[in-house]
Amino acid sequence: LTWAYKNSLDVLFIQEHNGNRDKVSEWKAMCERSGYSIVHGLHNDTTGSGRGAAALLTKMSTFNLTEADSETQPSVGGRIAHKKVLWKDMILNLVSIYVPVNADERRDFLKQQMFNHRKIPAGSIIGGDFNCVENPIFDVVKENGGTYQNKHAGLMKTVMRKKQTSDVFYKLHGNRARAYTRETSEIRTRLDRIYAKDTNSQLVWHSHKLDHTYVNY
């Protein structure tokens, strides 16, 4: 987080954190020491471990936030963290999302989000691990040349269109550009993406950074 602050990162979309309620106070204090507020996604099943998967960190000085803006948000699997912020003269909805890796769970989760306007308002800026790609021709390289199982990617794209957003990477580089956020010896994929309003937006995108790197803290 010290590195993020020094490099002027205003928003961090984090997924698959697996932190439970016992981590809330510790993570809140850690973020605030580095100048960030945190929206900590937690599983809404209070009878279980309360583990979550999504977190959203926003730089307090950029958005005129205070420690009081840190919060926990329950959702199915803790997979969504949402914050409405004011930037310049614009109201921005920021959403961190973790889409399930299991194909059946992915389908059910995406269907639930189709009309979830409270957690994911139309025109949001959505950063997430989607566990499927936009276009397997350009977003996947398999060393063995096999077929990538991109199940329910069409549903994912339908949801993003319903939210009036499109892929920021394609906005910047064109829809035939190649890049990968997760790389192994066998496969490279662009699972991690940012979506933003596709028309009538006052935002100008210059660059963004995504990776699938494990963070230990």
Give the ranges of each region predicted by the language model.
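Generic beta-strand hydrophobic packing signal
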Residues: 17, 68, 83, 97, ...
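Metal-dependent phosphoesterases centered on the DNase I-like endonuclease/exonuclease/phosphatase
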Residues: 2-46, 108-200
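Short, charged, solvent-exposed linker or helix-capping segments at domain edges/interfaces
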Residues: 65-72, 107, 204-208
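Structured beta-strand-rich core segments of catalytic domains in phosphoester-bond hydrolases
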Residues: 15-93, 97
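Surface polyanion/phosphate-binding segment centered on an Asp-His-Pro turn
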Residues: 84-89, 124-127, 187-189, 193-217
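A short catalytic or substrate-binding loop motif that flags glycine-/basic-rich loops and adjacent residues
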Residues: 46-51, 73-78, 103, 173-174, ...
